[in-house]
């Protein structure tokens, strides 16, 4: 959810560098003081990547493609430096007028005539380039989008376990960023084969000869007289380099004419041509590192050393295995540490926004290259200029295509602040160049040890995408090659230093790393334990002495993502439920009055401030003026900073985006002070739900199957009320019969309908509307045809007579309504940019207050979700000794089997916090209990005891945190003591008002003639096969007939039934449904002549008559049989056209 003022000046870029200042101090239960390594900016992954692209990426792509020469080599086009101009339109205007927030890109282009050396130079406009906003999103056609980071396999050299161990022993592959794959396979029969681009295999020595490794002796000498190579040479029939080249050509291009030149070109083109083969910088780095080579970094094609090095590594491992085990029966667990695996984070890298956009830009430039070549050839030398020869359409369309339709450019999730933050930190293994849902193996989806501190092991979707979409861990960052790094504190001789180093998964394996909660002397930094639990080299967990430790975790939070780190007592929850908890926080609706949790984790502040949803002061100063929509701060140097607040805007998901000032006039502020709250924050902290008093007890069976009972107080006092904003749009177009018109003059409209419309037929702001009300009056001309020229002339002379128009007004859809909060009007006359054929457009925003209702979904932060089954009056709810009724009743059976005990601990600590932890005069205190190092059971017991001693005795709380509750209806106490306390409850976006739906008459499908399905189509309820069986089992024949005919696809029957209902007559008996006729047609299409028979007696009489005629004809010798005309299988009259076809 983007909530920042819209300044179109570059100084705004500085705003993100301000360090936010905490407003609310929490009582902390943290057992560890984290190192000085503060959290990095949580959306840095987006911002820095795009900045790098702007600074270097464009320049690099232009250098790669430059120069473009024509086919004869006489002309060249070179690309020089580039520059961006200021965006012509502000972010706010882009959002209201459906424009893209972009800056014009200009590139210096030189056209060179090689013969004369003449150079013509010009700045060429390369199109508008979408810009990233300061909070890491893009505005494309007026909607906010996020480019998700892609998780892909890194190019490089790999030796891996084979897919089929009965055929191969090991496989090795050289994977480029772009180009042909080279794969080596050690066969169980004891030789080595090679595949290029997954084509047919050939002995590896054939390729080696073709690449110029020499004859058999030289090859053997190069590979240390390996027996595998000797076996391979025995299978190799080629005798010379030329033979080998021709053999490679035959395997790669079967059926093409073979000659030596083509063969040499093929091999050179496959691996050594920079245009067709690109290892990329990352690939070269990985290959050099893995094979211990020192090929220069800028060589991005394969070299002979790469191929030799990979083969050496493969042969070394294979021969070592052969010494101990027989090929075909190998225990791979024993040699796993020597092999590479796809899931290892040293072999997977991130393609961040910048790289993805750069790839789209490169594709556009290469498309443009072809056009430029053709133009240089066809145009006249005198008239050619850079402007005429460069066509920028392909570049603009490639960029547009990426932002508009790439799988990784997504409609931003703005349900609340956390949803937007999580979306920007998402890692997606799918998309172009990634995996597909169907082909992704289990291993890729699984948690891997190298995820530690890099990708969250908990937060991932539950459906078919599980494990393919992840979240960046809190402290993780991305290095220059796209590998994820995580921070560790350096340990020297058993003493922990304050030096923090970021390590990638590859580097980490060479060290021994201790946990964050290793006991350390705060004064000296020495590790006090005699033995330390640590991950040793290679990743196994062991105990070591303090002197052996090289690094130590920075914080226990570094393993999990932001959403997961917001779950208190995460360590007491089962992982499956924690996953649901993390995911459901992203679906929480911002409430009317936001409230931070009593029991937090200390991450709430950074999670809210880094997203740009709260307003931070850019400079220190004094607040001079505060209104609901503006804050003015006078800086210390005397200048003014003005901040615009967003008021009641609609998010992508229809929730409300609103900012409220927190400062008062005259208040002194520092740089980074929180000036205004967003819609789901409170005092600058993330606030997704409400602290409610819950009791764990059954109540009349209403909390069966996780259902929830709530008090009517939550409805009356708007505790769980949220605002939702819907947008409706109408366009007045040009039609064949004339233009549509937005007007108050609607045919056959009563005064009641027009009551809230202004003179132009547009609803006034503040009007309350319900379903069916007119929002914008619009009429469309109707008529059989265009008027003749004579008619037009008469009309021109005598003036326009009332033309035939039909009402096509914009009305509030079925089941919706609310208060009109804003109207935006755009017209061609006012100079607005509208789609072709549209003269005028009106947008109406309608806000609804949604109170909590039965059927709404509530959830805690521990995956404890349920649907409200009953709203009980306050006086009937169970109450405590002091008369306080509880707000929510949850089922106790939902806890043990789900193993999310965190909710119970939260409830106990929440109760103590609500009473000020026995201090603070009984006023609530906000506490923080960080994940994996927060409050213990002893801490909670101590807090409860303190509250019991200091002033909350009247509640009757016992030592274990339980109370006696009394039945609100009878006043009798319940038999057993009950756990009661404060839990943070979220209202989720799955609201009953959006789901409830009923249909009387509505649209039908053209194909099947059955009602459409779904609320959006105003469809019916599907009465499926199993439901039909149920009615058949009860013998409810008439009910079933009605459901299958007049309520479904009996076209005539349904019209007659409607007529009968209107006239108050009995409903006639149904006729044949359309689906039966489809079945008939299908059978006829199989050549079966299916003829419906209606009147059996009439048919038998007809048959008898026909037999009599036949006998008479035979007696007279007359042939009265006739051939059936070809192509007409069914010659019966359509006897059931009475039933309506």
Curated annotation (Swiss-Prot):
Give the superkingdom in one word. Answer: Bacteria
Q: Which GO terms describe its cellular component?
A: DNA-directed RNA polymerase complex
Q: What CDD domains does the entry give? A: RNA_pol_B_RPB2 (cd00653)
**Secretion signal span:** none
GO BP term, pick one = DNA-templated transcription
Its keywords, alphabetically, are: DNA-directed RNA polymerase, Nucleotidyltransferase, Transcription, Transferase
Q: Please give the function described in this protein's UniProt entry.
A: DNA-dependent RNA polymerase catalyzes the transcription of DNA into RNA using the four ribonucleoside triphosphates as substrates.
Give the family per the record: Belongs to the RNA polymerase beta chain family.
Q: This chain belongs to which protein, by name?
A: DNA-directed RNA polymerase subunit beta
Q: Which organism is it from?
A: Rubrobacter xylanophilus (strain DSM 9941 / JCM 11954 / NBRC 16129 / PRD-1)
The coding gene here is rpoB
């Amino acid at each position: 959810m983007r909530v920042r003022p819209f300044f179109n000046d570059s100084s705004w870029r500085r705003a993100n560098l301000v360090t936010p200042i905490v407003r609310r101090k929490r009582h902390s239960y943290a057992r560890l003081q984290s190192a000085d390594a503060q959290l990095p900016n949580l959306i840095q992954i987006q911002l820095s990547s795009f900045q790098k692209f702007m600074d270097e990426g464009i320049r690099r792509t232009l250098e790669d493609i430059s120069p473009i020469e024509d086919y004869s080599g006489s002309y060249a086009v070179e690309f020089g430096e580039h520059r961006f101009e200021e965006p012509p339109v502000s972010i706010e205007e882009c959002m209201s007028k459906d424009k893209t927030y972009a800056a014009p890109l200009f590139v210096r282009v030189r056209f060179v005539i090689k013969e004369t050396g003449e150079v013509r130079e010009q700045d060429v406009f390369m199109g508008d380039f979408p810009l990233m906003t300061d909070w890491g999103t893009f505005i494309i056609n007026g909607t906010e989008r996020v480019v998700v980071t892609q998780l892909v396999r890194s190019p490089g050299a790999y030796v891996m376990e084979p897919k089929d161990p009965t055929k191969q022993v090991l496989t090795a592959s050289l994977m480029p960023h772009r180009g042909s794959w080279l794969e080596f396979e050690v066969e169980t029969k004891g030789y080595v084969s090679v595949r290029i681009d997954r084509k047919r295999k050939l002995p590896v020595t054939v390729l080696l000869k073709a690449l110029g490794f020499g004859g058999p002796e030289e090859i053997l000498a190069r590979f240390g007289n390996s027996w595998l190579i000797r076996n391979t040479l025995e299978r190799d029939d080629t005798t010379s380099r030329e033979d080998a080249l021709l053999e490679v050509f035959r395997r790669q291009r079967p059926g093409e004419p073979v000659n030596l030149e083509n063969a040499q070109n093929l091999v050179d083109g496959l691996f050594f041509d920079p245009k067709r083969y690109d290892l990329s910088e990352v690939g070269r780095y990985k290959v050099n590192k893995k094979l211990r080579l020192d090929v220069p970094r800028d060589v991005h094609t394969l070299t002979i050393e790469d191929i030799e090095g990979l083969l050496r590594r493969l042969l070394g491992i294979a021969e070592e295995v052969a010494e101990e085990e027989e090929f075909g029966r190998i225990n791979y667990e024993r040699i796993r540490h020597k092999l590479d695996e796809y899931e290892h984070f040293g072999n997977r890298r991130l393609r961040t926004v910048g790289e993805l956009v750069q790839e789209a830009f490169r594709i556009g430039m290469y498309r443009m290259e072809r056009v430029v070549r053709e133009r240089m050839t066809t145009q006249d030398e005198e008239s050619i200029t850079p402007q005429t020869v460069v066509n920028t359409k392909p570049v603009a369309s490639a960029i547009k295509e990426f932002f508009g339709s790439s799988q990784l450019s997504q409609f931003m999730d703005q349900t609340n602040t956390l949803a937007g933050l999580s979306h920007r930190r998402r890692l997606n293994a799918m998309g172009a160049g990634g995996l597909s849902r169907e082909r992704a193996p289990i291993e890729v989806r699984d948690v891997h040890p190298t995820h530690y501190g890099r990708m969250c092991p908990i937060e991932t979707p539950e459906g078919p995408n599980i494990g393919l979409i992840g979240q960046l861990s809190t402290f993780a960052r991305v290095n220059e090659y796209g590998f994820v790094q995580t921070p560790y504190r350096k340990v020297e001789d058993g003493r922990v230093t304050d030096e923090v180093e970021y390590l990638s998964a590859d580097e980490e394996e060479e060290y021994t790393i201790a946990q964050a909660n290793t006991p350390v002397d705060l004064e000296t930094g020495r590790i006090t334990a005699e033995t330390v639990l640590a991950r040793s080299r290679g990743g196994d967990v062991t105990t070591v002495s303090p002197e052996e430790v090289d690094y130590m975790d920075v914080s226990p939070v570094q393993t999990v993502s932001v959403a997961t780190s917001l779950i208190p007592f995460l360590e007491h929850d089962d992982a499956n439920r924690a996953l649901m908890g993390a995911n459901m926080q992203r679906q929480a609706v911002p409430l009317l009055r936001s409230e931070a949790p009593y029991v937090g984790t200390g991450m709430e502040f950074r999670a809210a401030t880094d997203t740009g949803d709260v307003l931070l002061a850019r400079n220190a100063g004094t607040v001079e003026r505060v209104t609901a929509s503006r804050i003015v701060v006078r800086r210390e140097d005397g200048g003014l900073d003005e901040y615009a607040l967003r008021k009641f805007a609609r998010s992508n998901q229809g929730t409300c985006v609103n900012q409220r000032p927190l400062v008062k006039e005259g208040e002194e502020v520092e740089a980074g002070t929180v000036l205004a709250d967003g819609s789901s924050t409170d005092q600058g902290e993330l606030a997704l739900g409400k602290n409610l008093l819950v009791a764990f007890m059954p109540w009349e069976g209403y909390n069966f199957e996780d259902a929830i009972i709530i008090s009517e107080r939550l409805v009356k006092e708007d505790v769980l009320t949220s605002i939702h904003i819907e947008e409706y749009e109408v366009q007045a177009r040009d039609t064949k019969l004339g233009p549509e018109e937005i007007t108050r003059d609607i045919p056959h409209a009563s005064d009641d309908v027009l009551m809230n419309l202004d003179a132009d037929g547009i609803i006034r702001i503040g009007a309350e509307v319900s379903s069916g009300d007119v929002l914008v009056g619009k009429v469309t001309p109707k008529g059989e045809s265009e008027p003749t020229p004579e008619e037009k002339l008469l009309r021109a002379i005598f003036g326009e007579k009332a033309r035939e128009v039909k009402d096509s007004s914009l009305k509030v859809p079925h089941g919706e309504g609310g208060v009109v909060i804003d109207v935006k009007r755009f017209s061609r006359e006012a100079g607005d940019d509208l789609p072709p054929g549209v003269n005028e457009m009106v947008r109406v925003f309608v806000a609804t207050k949604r109170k909590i209702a039965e059927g709404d979904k509530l959830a805690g932060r521990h995956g404890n979700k349920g649907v409200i089954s009953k709203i009980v009056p306050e006086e009937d709810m169970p109450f405590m000794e002091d008369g306080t009724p509880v707000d929510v009743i949850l089922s106790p059976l939902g806890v043990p089997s789900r193993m999310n005990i965190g909710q119970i601990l939260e409830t106990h600590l929440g109760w103590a916090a609500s009473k000020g932890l026995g201090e603070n005069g009984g006023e609530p205190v906000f506490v923080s209990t960080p994940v994996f190092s927060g409050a213990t059971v002893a801490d909670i017991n101590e807090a409860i005891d303190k509250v019991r001693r200091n002033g909350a005795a009247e509640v009757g709380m016992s030592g274990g945190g339980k109370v006696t509750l009394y039945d609100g209806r009878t006043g009798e106490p319940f038999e057993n003591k009950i756990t009661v306390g404060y839990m943070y409850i979220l209202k989720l976006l799955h609201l009953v008002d959006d789901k409830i739906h009923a249909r009387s008459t509505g649209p039908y499908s053209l194909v099947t003639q059955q009602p459409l399905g779904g609320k959006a189509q105003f469809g019916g309820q599907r009465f499926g096969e199993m439901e039909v069986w149920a009615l058949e089992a009860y013998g409810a024949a008439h009910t079933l007939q009605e459901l299958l005919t007049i309520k479904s696809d009996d076209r005539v029957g349904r019209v007659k039934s409607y007529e009968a209902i209107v006239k108050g007559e009995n409903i006639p008996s149904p006729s044949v449904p359309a689906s039966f006729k489809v079945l008939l047609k299908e059978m006829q299409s199989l050549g079966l002549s299916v003829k419906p028979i209606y009147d059996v007696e009439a048919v038998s009489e007809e048959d008898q008559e026909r037999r009599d005629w036949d006998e008479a004809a035979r007696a007279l010798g007359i042939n009265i049989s006739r051939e059936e005309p070809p192509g007409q299988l069914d010659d019966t009259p359509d006897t059931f056209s009475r039933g309506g076809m």
